Amino acid sequence: MRFYIAFFFLLLAADMALSFEIGNSEELERLSMVYGEVESERGCTHGSCENGETCCDGWRCRYTGRAVPFMCVP
């Protein structure tokens, strides 16, 4: 019985972690849309910087280890 309870909480934790990750992806997408107009005018980015793009507003290019490996972060 203890095994089933532990397994349930393990599944719950995994579900919460995936929900958090999806939420962050949606937030990054929203921010990239907001900053998109500013970026095109200034020639810098708040998004992906894996091809040598310059980050805006003092943000730095960092390795994220996700689908887009290098992103500009505050």
UniProtKB/Swiss-Prot annotation:
Keywords attached to this Swiss-Prot or TrEMBL record, sorted alphabetically, are: Disulfide bond, Knottin, Secreted, Signal, Toxin
Signal peptide coordinates: 1-19
- Secreted: is it a keyword of this entry? yes
Gene Ontology CC terms, in alphabetical order: extracellular region
Q: How would you summarize where this protein is expressed among tissues?
A: Expressed by the venom gland.
**Location within or outside the cell:** Secreted
Q: Name one GO molecular function term.
A: toxin activity
Q: List the disulfide bonds.
A: C44-C56, C49-C61, C55-C72
Propeptide positions in this record?
Answer: 20-30
- Please state what the annotation says regarding this protein's domains: The presence of a 'disulfide through disulfide knot' structurally defines this protein as a knottin.
Q: What is the protein's name according to its record? A: U6-agatoxin-Ao1a
What organism is recorded for this protein?
Agelena orientalis (Funnel-web spider)
